[in-house]
Amino acid sequence: MTNRKDDHIKYALDYRSPYNSFDDIELIHHSLPDYDLAEIDLSTHFAGQDFDFPFYINAMTGGSQKGKEVNEKLAQVADTCGLLFVTGSYSTALKNPDDTSYQVKKSRPHLLLATNIGLDKPYQAGLQAVRDLQPLFLQVHINLMQELLMPEGEREFRSWKKHLSDYAKKLQLPFILKEVGFGMDVKTIQTAIDLGVKTVDISGRGGTSFAYIENRRGGNRSYLNQWGQTTAQVLLNAQPLMDKVEILASGGIRHPLDIIKALVLGAKAVGLSRTMLELVEQHSVHEVIAIVNGWKEDLRLIMCALNCQTIAELRNVDYLLYGRLREGQRQ
């Protein structure tokens, strides 16, 4: 397990998607704003919580010494910058009580913390993660293609809908259903809504590719490395469901402009995984904190140029679609 978790970090950093759907979106500049820059409000609300900023550090790793080091750095960045931090899957800690790679809040009592577990795990496992870490919410990831590509992956999936229903009915804490970079299709989102899910992270293609990661770990199905739908495509497809469920976006988010574009397409907030992993691997924690704080100002700047005072107002921004993204909307 330790080697697998470390492989995930190594190969996630290696991968570069050949296409990012956010490059096919052009936002329409507004020349005469109604607001001062200081009036721009970055706050948002999802999963029953208010957050000061519309982006967060999404689930990545844990379960190894390397994972612990990464989590400590990310937690320090999140705590200092006032961002939400979601740990990687807690399943390894359930198997190993001595695993402390997720225990990042003990020295940071004010950290905005959430944790993650796979949908292959029953409700009781998620409940144990909640009891151990006391998170703001539980993120439940759905990773079908990754499981199929892993030699040691799951092969029985009939229980997944029951697990999801159990979380929706029994968990006395908000939870989010999260894809892992393959894009959550509209039918799956609707099924989740029918089962009682209130918030989903559609996590599309364009960032971390677990197909690539598992193929680098020894698989021979590299033709599936680009499996799934891109983040922007999923957001566009999910427009009819925006009033029925809270939608978060992740997958291929590189910088503040990508964050804004995802918010324009209806996301309540935006998660970053690989980008944050790369930052803490290439820079000191203090340098990353400075970069992230700079992003906050960049978001305000872009919102001012779009004449938007709040995150909700971004939904009214005009935009143009190009290339693959535009072609996808014609079908």
Swiss-Prot record:
EC class: isomerase
Catalytic reaction(s) noted: isopentenyl diphosphate = dimethylallyl diphosphate
Gene Ontology CC terms: cytoplasm
Main localization of the protein described in the UniProt heading: cytoplasm
Positions of FMN binding: 59-61, 89, 116, 178, 203, 208, 252-254, 273-274
Molecular function per GO: FMN binding; isopentenyl-diphosphate delta-isomerase activity; magnesium ion binding; NADPH binding; oxidoreductase activity
EC number(s) on file: 5.3.3.2
Key words, A-Z: Cytoplasm, Flavoprotein, FMN, Isomerase, Isoprene biosynthesis, Magnesium, Metal-binding, NADP
Its job: Involved in the biosynthesis of isoprenoids. Catalyzes the 1,3-allylic rearrangement of the homoallylic substrate isopentenyl (IPP) to its allylic isomer, dimethylallyl diphosphate (DMAPP).
Quaternary structure annotation from Swiss-Prot or TrEMBL: Homooctamer. Dimer of tetramers.
Similarity section: Belongs to the IPP isomerase type 2 family.
Protein name per Swiss-Prot or TrEMBL: Isopentenyl-diphosphate delta-isomerase
Species in which this protein is naturally found: Streptococcus mutans serotype c (strain ATCC 700610 / UA159)
